């Protein structure tokens, strides 16, 4: 309980952005939380935590580094704090931390933690301007990709009356973009490709003509985003005797993620392969997908969206050996190498999808999704902040509907903070129900979706994409256009 400020629930914790032992009192450890979530002192003996008034308004600046210094051996210690844009010093009173005094307005509150304590006046030492100017082409791509609001459309819905229904929906809602599968979750190219390799391995299922879909999108004033599922690819996995498949080191064959299904009537159990993963270290796999992206670019698609830029997360992943891994290359380096190469060949904006928690916090040792690194090469990050996919006890003290808004608002802010202006943040909005959400009545699920949208807008996201794998956007029950145009003040 003393470290309540660290706990988010569901086994998740806030990031500690800096830490320093107090030389005047070894019992005290000073630490700050990332994303402007506060400055604290932990008293090891009493196992208590004091919240300290930070050198800037809570939430407006993060303390990135703490250190103790003094001018001479007989002088008193002072605390130095490096925030996002400045250096500050704080002389420490000889008697220790003072009782609460002038603590400012609306400080963060934590269960079992004292209100912020006034320990003296922070003194500004210098302002720091670390922001590096972005290259002109990067600025141009980000501007082209900004403020895009749309829906995901499966390739099976990309022609005829089904496509028309989606176009009518987009127009009625005041939306201006569409994400369309050009290489789907099974590894099939869904258009009339001219590329020899996908044709040779049987990885083409034409569902529309690329020239037609580009013309139709642009005629309707839509920004067309071409989705390419990269490292999850059943067709390339099977091609050429599984030459490029993730490899099972024990079975000495293609690695398989096996799942079970049970027949509700007979109880019969069936085992099947759930996902097919190719080797993210393989340069052939990189080139195969980059060639597809280049073909889309040449055909007039406005943006390339790479999905599944990660390593597998489920199954016996410890049993995988990566046959194309070069000495010294880790998972993050593999993904970075792919994105760096893609950037060389693509002049249009690149976006990539990431797990919601990978946009909420800096993590890279799980599936190697690291948006700080991604943002050096891509122009748009699309975190999937689906509230249903966070553990229920994550922010578990909040009611479900306000929690949905907070996850999107806070997550969008955190993602923007992590990438430091190098990428647009355009979250995927959960437009489907799962688990307990399936019992929501229309007014409830409508509020749920609107809360997500408002969270994105109030978190300063630059657009959003509604996601429903079945392409049924029934959760949208009020026009989104006015909400988007009026921003966060439209509906409360």
Residue ranges of predicted features:
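Short coil-to-beta transitions that initiate beta-strands within beta-rich domains
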Residues: 7-24, 54-73
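Short loop/turn segments immediately following the C-termini of beta-strands
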Residues: 24, 34-35, 44, 71, ...
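Conserved beta-propeller blade signature
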Residues: 28-31, 76-81
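Short loop/turn segments that connect beta-strands within beta-propeller blades
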Residues: 43-47, 93-95
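Active-site-adjacent "subsite" loops/lids of carbohydrate-active enzymes
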Residues: 141-158, 231-298, 447-451
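Aromatic-lined carbohydrate-recognition surfaces of secreted/lumenal glycan-active proteins
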Residues: 152, 223-233, 305-312, 331-367, ...
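Catalytic domains of carbohydrate-active enzymes, especially glycoside hydrolases
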Residues: 163-188, 298-303, 377-380, 458-464
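Substrate-binding cleft of secreted/luminal carbohydrate-active enzymes
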Residues: 378-392, 400-409, 414-491
